[in-house]
Swiss-Prot record:
F(1)F(0) ATP synthase produces ATP from ADP in the presence of a proton or sodium gradient. F-type ATPases consist of two structural domains, F(1) containing the extramembraneous catalytic core and F(0) containing the membrane proton channel, linked together by a central stalk and a peripheral stalk. During catalysis, ATP synthesis in the catalytic domain of F(1) is coupled via a rotary mechanism of the central stalk subunits to proton translocation. The gene is atpB. F-type ATPases have 2 components, F(1) - the catalytic core - and F(0) - the membrane proton channel. F(1) has five subunits: alpha(3), beta(3), gamma(1), delta(1), epsilon(1). F(0) has four main subunits: a(1), b(1), b'(1) and c(10-14). The alpha and beta chains form an alternating ring which encloses part of the gamma chain. F(1) is attached to F(0) by a central stalk formed by the gamma and epsilon chains, while a peripheral stalk is formed by the delta, b and b' chains. This is ATP synthase subunit beta, chloroplastic. It catalyses: ATP + H2O + 4 H(+)(in) = ADP + phosphate + 5 H(+)(out). In plastids the F-type ATPase is also known as CF(1)CF(0). It is found in: Plastid, Chloroplast thylakoid membrane.
């Protein structure tokens, strides 16, 4: 081994298997687990390469195995590797607002370098138990089905569950639109292993709506961190931690209330499974990594509210093959305060948002938190829809005419409720042509109260489809006659 390696803490690449690198160091100079290593060299075409990787395993004989955060094409055995002596560290604070970063904390929005004042390592411990905040309050989203049946907790963790193409990203974009704009604090968005086009659409939408202020970036209310589908698995596995580190700084140092959006937490698990296989670990159930629960817990326990400030997290969760018992969504369930489950059956009927009112849950749905009126209204909706679900087999075989008068009334009201739970979204105006609607919780409860009081039994059910509050449904019914 050459003198250069003896004098500096440098190593050499001895093996490259896709994004996994084996690197040998001088005796006594082996880097710690999670240390960042950098490779700066020229490839065979003479192009400058800058690759960062993270130590994952110590193999013995002064050799470590690291996972790359960048593409490894062009790397060769024998190239020099420098140990930075610390974990990946990313910029934090006001300088991150209005900018798009990659997993390494480098800006990728072609708007110049960031004046880095402070950096923090992406691997940090969760807040101590005694520092946690346990106050209970809900926050309004302006989306009827969510506010009524599965209300979100301020400073809690919320999961949006759904298979492919049922509307998770549109729902998360609407929540950003409704909450982030009215929200006094800051938001951090982590794009984990999703489409580049969606990230670009979100960025453009935020600039148009004033959430990102291009002329004075420090007035912006959001920081974006992207690691798209085409990134190596190491980057997709760590990008959520990069974004979370930025969010934690706003909470702990600036003492702000932070909204933290992740789209999609399943891709974090998926990337972890890829890395686990590349590192040669024995897979567990359905091919997932054996460390699935540990990795998920390590991320989720850091997303919490302390006495200094809060992080309210909204996470989209892809459900493979619509199977909620799959280990990835099942592990995520354990950490959440509210679950919004999207249904393919409702999406097929054209009811958007396709939120399943019976599957979606919230720990906040308690009479002593919400008040009796809200709680009773939510339970009446669930009871009616559950009875309608039970009657569907009878209707399919014998028809509506065979039902009792009481059951026919339940079916009629349930169909109106199902349609009234749909709503036009601001972010979907370009697809639907209908202007978006924000419905306050009071208006939502009032609307369902009128349906159950029988005041609207004579209105056609299509009057309730894709409207905002109940007044709109009544005026739509008048125009249908």
């Amino acid at each position: 081994m050459s003198d250069s390696i003896e004098t500096k803490n440098m190593g050499r690449i001895v093996q490259i298997i896709g994004p996994v690198l084996d690197i040998v160091f001088a005796k006594g100079q082996v880097p710690n687990i999670y240390n960042a290593l950098t490779i700066r060299a020229k490839n065979s075409a003479g192009t400058e390469m800058a690759v960062t990787c993270e130590v994952q395993q110590l193999l013995g004989d002064n050799c470590v195995r690291a996972v790359s955060m960048n593409p490894t094409e062009g790397l060769m055995r024998g190239m020099e590797v420098v140990d930075t002596g610390k974990p990946l560290s990313v910029p934090v604070g006001k300088v991150t607002l209005g900018r798009i970063f990659n997993v390494l904390g480098e800006p990728v929005d072609n708007m110049g370098n960031v004046k880095v004042e402070e950096t923090l390592p992406i691997h940090r411990t969760a807040p101590a138990f005694v520092d946690l905040d346990t106050r209970l309050s809900i926050f309004e989203t302006g989306i009827k089905v969510v506010d009524l049946l599965a209300p979100y907790r301020r400073g809690g963790k919320i999961g949006l569950f759904g298979g492919a193409g049922v509307g998770k990203t549109v729902l998360i974009m609407e929540l950003i639109n409704n909450i982030a704009k009215a929200h006094g604090g800051v938001s951090v968005f982590a794009g984990v292993g999703e489409r580049t086009r969606e990230g670009n659409d979100l960025y453009t939408e935020m600039k148009e709506s004033g959430v990102i202020v291009e002329k004075n970036l420090s007035d912006s209310k959001v920081a974006l961190v992207y690691g798209q589908m085409n990134e190596p698995p190491g980057a997709r596995m760590r990008v959520a931690l990069t974004a979370l580190t930025m969010a934690e700084y706003f909470r702990d140092v600036n003492k702000q209330d932070v909204l933290f959006f992740i789209d999609n937490i399943f891709r974090f698990v998926q990337a972890g499974a890829e890395v686990s296989a590349l590192l040669g670990r024995m897979p567990s159930a359905v091919g997932y990594q054996p460390t699935l629960a540990t990795e998920m817990g390590g991320l989720q326990e850091r997303i919490t509210s302390t006495k200094d400030g809060s992080i309210t997290s909204i996470q989209a969760v892809y459900v493979p093959a619509d199977d909620l018992t799959d280990p990835a969504p099942a592990t995520t369930f354990a950490h959440l305060d509210a679950t919004t489950v999207l249904s393919r059956n409702l999406a097929a009927k054209g009811i958007y948002p396709a939120v399943d009112p019976l599957e979606s849950t919230s720990t906040m749905l308690q009479p002593w938190i919400l008040g009796e009126k809200h709680y009773d209204s939510a339970q009446s909706v669930k009871k009616t829809l559950q009875r309608y679900k039970e009657l569907q087999d009878i209707i399919a075989i014998l028809g509506l005419d065979e039902l009792s008068e009481e059951d026919r009334l339940i079916v009629a009201r349930a169909r109106k409720i199902e349609r009234f739970l749909s709503q036009p979204f601001f972010v979907a105006e370009v697809f639907t042509g209908s202007p978006g609607k924000y419905v306050s919780l009071a208006e939502t409860i009032e609307g369902f109260g009128k349906i159950f009081a029988g005041e609207l039994d004579d209105l056609p059910e299509q009057a309730f489809y894709l409207v905002g509050n109940i007044t709109e449904a009544i005026s739509k019914a008048a125009s249908l006659k």
